[in-house]
Amino acid sequence: MVRKDRRPNVLLITCDQWRGDCLSAAGHKVVRTPNADALAAEGVLFRQHFGGAAPCSPARACLYTGLYQMNNRVCRNGTPLDARHGNIALSARSLGYDPTLFGYTDVSPDPRTLAPGDPRLRSYEGVLPGFTVRQLLPEHQKPWLSWLEARGIDSSAGFPGIHRPADEIVAATTDGAVTTSPPVYSKDETPAAFLTGEFARWLGEQEGDTPWFAHLSFLSPHPPFIVPEPYNKIYDPADGTTFRRAANWQAEAQSHPYLAYELGQQQRANFRPGAEGKVRDWGDDNFRRIRALYYGMISEVDAQLGRIWQAVKAADAWDDTIIVLTSDHAEMMGDHFMLGKGGFFDGSFHIPLIIRDPRRRKAAGASVDRFTEAVDIAPTLLDLLGEVFPPHLDGQSLKPFLDAGEPDNWREAAHWEFDFRSVADADAERHFGIGPRQCNLAVIRTKQFKYVHFAGGLPPLLFDLEKDQDELSNVAADPAYLPVRLELAERLLAWRAEHLDQSLALAELTEDGVVGHVAGLPLFQS
């Protein structure tokens, strides 16, 4: 029963590197996600949801702050988040919640707020201000490794060695072949299972009349690509959609200077510990085996979602809990001979989004095909909690969709940004002969077209998605498409002009004092 005399609970679940098309509820012909599907059956599935940036830190900055990268300025993993920006955790805390974290947020702290020798300045994996940490699980995964040791599992290999096959068959043989052998830990001992158990224990400690706010941040299906039995075998490598790619990687590299650079950068060891060589040189059989493992990792996370649903129901909180399930960014998974995330392809930025608000059943089971973005999450949660979200945020509330309606003047395109500067080693800067401020791109994607604009003199891209769903033919220089290119370039420029930082621009000092909106700390107070 929904209790109307108090604020609802909030459960924000993020996965890492989950493609938006890899949900059975979204019509995927291979991947099975019964627990995510069950959530969609009681909530709303947003089919055209896109992340705002990549990799993890930039993507999460968009999600947590409700600001585009052009305004939050988190460009890479390790770029500090300006302390003047608030976020959804600070906002929830101002509303009386104690936002509690299970996992990680990958938010680097503002160095100006810390002493020069502060150890938090030596890692990009800081904690978003506003969160109480119940169980931290950063990339080194040491808390989970200690938990494995306590269960009798030898975890001395550390990270990422723990994610190599248990039978000591290395991740790549002399010919580079990929094995689907399982790791030393079981399906009940994965990092996701560990975090789920910690959340369930914490949930059992909560007072029934006090609303809670929890954020579960799962690393999976992020690499290393390995998964325990039975998930390593439930998908046949021969199954799956056709890879979206040219005839060979050389053709991809010749299509644009950025793709040539990225294909040369990707190392197998970043995805399969112990593997040698470049990702681009793997054959289709290896890409298919990796894809089968990736699908298995998604199903393993989905099984943990089932445990979470059971825990929330056992706590008699199911009818009082808003649940948001999404990802930070997606995964190329063999498309264009690449793995990982970044660049401009849909494969890196199209992500899942399911929202269930038990107070809003009118649209239960519906799906939305309008473009939604990661920056919409923060204003949506505020709106669902009864707060007026401030006008300087870049995102918009999805609440009308949850009420089986549609907001006025909704966007007709998705937008995202990608910054490929490398401040620590200046690799990209040297390669392209440009400065760090020029190592970036911006995308506008409509239902029919995608336009990609690069700084630094790199050539633009234009794809006719109705004729070229795989994004293989750049028509930016085709005279027949010049009017389209001009229109989209103008729309992209207008989008950037409209979303210039409004933190103080919406306020004015008058004889009567401050008029308008001032963004303060926390961000969502005026």
Descriptions of predicted regions:
Residues 501-519:
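Short, charged, surface-exposed hinge/linker loops at domain edges
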Residues 1-450, 460, 470-490, 517-526:
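Formylglycine-dependent sulfatase
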Residues 452-454:
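Short beta-strand micro-motifs enriched in acidic
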Residues 482-506:
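A contiguous, mid-protein "functional segment" used to position or interact
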